[in-house]
Amino acid sequence: MAPKQSSHLTLAWAFLPLILFLFPLLIESRSTPPSHLPKEGKHHHQPFEFIKKLEGCHKGETVKGLHQLKQYFEKFGYLPRHLTNTTTNDDDSFDDLLESTVKSYQLNYHLNVTGELDAATVKQMTRPRCGVPDVVNGRTRSGKDGRHLNSAQLHVVSHYEFFPGEPRWRKSHLTYGFLSGVQSIDIQSLRSICASAFARWQRVSIFTFEEIGDVNSADLKIGFFRGNHGDGAHNSFDGFQGTLAHAFSPPGGHFHFDADENWGINPSSNDAVDLESVAVHEIGHLLGLDHSFDTSAVMYAYFGYGLRKVNLAADDIAGIQDLYN
């Protein structure tokens, strides 16, 4: 028996280095969170999730949570602020005004205009999106479809929009810099991504862009922020998978990312938002473009995780060239 026991010990000692090598890897794999989960420190709630519980609601009902729906429509411009009861949070009635508001939203996003919170409307409303309102100061769509296109393009329908009063820059060379907010991505990657995003607009417009070190002197100021960051309560960021970013029309120049999002660089899965895609969209706002209701356009308000949308569509190009003639 002695020789057999010795052979077993010899075999065990032979595999010991392999066991010692694999053990730390096994421990690490058990302690590492799945890649699709929000990064540490991120908010795990989804700000628009409450809308799913309201699916099927229609005029004449009183349902808990409808006051939040009214706040959603207020935030994105469909309901004037003086008409919503946002202080007491007790207005849960689906009245005529809310029905009209839902219809306006459905019309803008090419949904069936039912006035009810049907499945398609709820699905659209719960997607992550830009924080810039679709409607400003009660302004509805201008109805300018096809009006600005030349004779060779009359078969094309335009969906681009401008901000009220059509604000625009009075110069063609714009400088930009980076604010010292929350660091969500390393500065060199951010600089490279933003340079690429600006270049996409430069190729189709009158503009040239230059990064400068003194952000206070820059025309355009870019940074990452959380929650209420000084832009007013209605422009507060809301955490993971809500509003992704916002930017101000000329000559405002401020462009802010929500630091609580999972930002990625050309992500290959649905665990991150592509930083450059959102940057291209927000730069359009900086230059004076409002949201487009063309789903292929960069200036379309809604976005999603794992998507990459950086190439300007015909509608984006027509919009910026129309605004600056």
Residue ranges and their predicted role:
Residues 2-325:
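Zinc-dependent metalloendopeptidases
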